[in-house]
Swiss-Prot record:
It catalyses: DNA(n) + a 2'-deoxyribonucleoside 5'-triphosphate = DNA(n+1) + diphosphate. Keywords: Endonuclease, Hydrolase, Nuclease, Nucleotidyltransferase, RNA-directed DNA polymerase, Transferase, Transposable element. Coiled coil: none annotated. It comes from Nasonia vitripennis. Residues 231-392 are annotated as: Nucleic acid-binding endonuclease. Residues 1-230 form the Reverse transcriptase domain. One of its GO terms (molecular function) is endonuclease activity. Its EC number is 2.7.7.49. This is Retrovirus-related Pol polyprotein from type-1 retrotransposable element R1 4. It is an enzyme of class 2 (transferase). It comes from the Eukaryota.
Length: 392
């Protein structure tokens, strides 16, 4: 038999008092475990020194152990099996990491170190024209990322701008791997493109569901959900409804992702219901406006001019999709039958409103981007040839 994750809190007004009580507690635990034929693991036993924050006026100030005055940097000396227990900057208890200030920075760091490498490796297996498809990546996301981040969220997650920024940075890296969009794509657009709630809203949903399962009322986005024993499913649906309302308000208020919002996905609920939308390397560029477009590359100082090499017009996703004469043949064959020759945003909305429309967009994006690359390569070779003749 074995037991796991035992936590002991020892209080004291001085270091000597804590050490005295701590030694007595350790001795008592070892004796009790021995009586039932259990051993306490010396290598897995760690401690953390939590110092009471000092109060300046009416505000508590967090203590950094490295900045403590004389005697503050020395670890407590409490032995187990003849060896001093190691005192760490952060510890893990029941799967949740916390630091000396009982904050969640350590847990966020743990999530980043665990999840980012995993999805980075998956990104390598999901290249633009081969490897894992969007459906497989989405399944891994729902089965690995969401449960891992939301685990015990009712105990560690606290709403706050700093916390949300850390978690959103982590989430953004994962979404880029799933949607195969460019790294310059905003977090707001990446969430909508993937059809998944922003992570801070997802955590609020997880916390609300936890309280409802415990038979308690839940609060999300300022809305109180009254627990009804006979209607837990209805309670969950109401939580998700409020979460989507929060997401929609956030999407409409965002100053980022304009190309995605105005042309393709003004409504987040409609996007989530459109399960036929499975972004790849090519469609992500069209749906976000971030990609192989001179206008965007010029903004990033990666292209000499913002104009299209074919017609001289601003080279962006809308021009590429509906206007550039170089791709008229592909457009007439694939896009026009779906859009009916309408202009944006009616035409672009029609391309994502049905499986047939998105299939046409996907094929057009693939062949048109390949054609564009060939045209630019031919133009580059021509310019190099002219330059060589001029030098001769």
């Amino acid at each position: 038999p074995f037991a796991d994750d035992l936590a002991v809190l020892v209080e004291g007004d001085s270091r000597a008092e804590i050490e005295k009580v701590g030694k007595a507690v350790v001795k008592h635990i070892v004796e009790r475990c021995s009586a039932i034929k259990l051993e306490v693991s010396e290598s897995k036993t760690v401690g953390i020194f939590v110092k009471k924050p000092k109060v300046v006026g009416s505000k508590a100030v967090k203590i950094n152990r490295k900045d403590c005055r004389k005697g503050g940097a020395r670890n407590l000396k409490i032995e187990l099996g003849g060896k001093s227990i190691s005192f760490e900057q952060s510890v893990r208890y029941l799967g949740v990491h916390f630091d000396a200030n009982l904050g969640i920075s350590a847990h966020c760091k743990y999530l980043r170190e665990k999840l980012v490498p995993l999805f980075s490796d998956l990104r390598k297996l999901a290249q633009c024209q081969w490897g894992l498809g969007h459906k497989a990546l989405e399944t891994i996301y729902k089965g690995v990322f969401v449960p891992t981040v939301c685990y015990a969220s009712a105990r560690w997650y606290k709403e706050g701008a700093h916390t949300d920024r850390i978690l959103e940075d982590l989430h953004r890296q994962i979404l880029i791997a799933i949607t195969r969009c460019y790294r310059s794509t905003s977090y707001e657009a990446a969430c909508v493109l993937a059809g998944t709630l922003p992570i801070c809203i997802q955590l609020r949903v997880s916390v609300a569901k936890y309280h409802l399962r415990k038979g308690e009322d839940a609060e999300i986005g300022g809305v109180v959900i009254r627990r009804r024993p006979e209607g837990l499913k209805e309670n969950y649906n109401r939580v998700l409804e409020v979460a989507n309302e929060m997401w929609q308000a956030r999407w409409e208020a965002s100053e980022q992702g304009n190309a995605t919002r105005e042309l393709f996905f003004p409504d987040v609920v409609a996007r989530v219901k459109s399960d036929w939308i499975r972004p790849d390397h090519f469609t992500s560029q069209v749906l976000t406006g971030h990609g192989y477009y001179n206008e965007k590359l010029h903004q990033l100082s990666l292209a000499k001019a913002a104009a299209c090499i074919c017609c001289g017009e601003p080279d962006n996703n809308l021009h590429f999709l509906l206007e550039c004469p170089a791709f008229a043949e592909f457009r007439d064959e694939l896009i026009t039958p779906v859009s009916g020759g309408l202009e944006a945003p009616e035409a672009t909305l029609m391309l994502v409103s049905s499986p047939e429309g998105f299939a046409a967009l996907k094929e057009y994006s693939r062949v048109a981007f390949e054609c564009k690359r060939q045209l630019e390569n031919a133009l580059t070779e021509s310019d190099e040839g002219l330059s060589s003749e001029s030098e001769e």
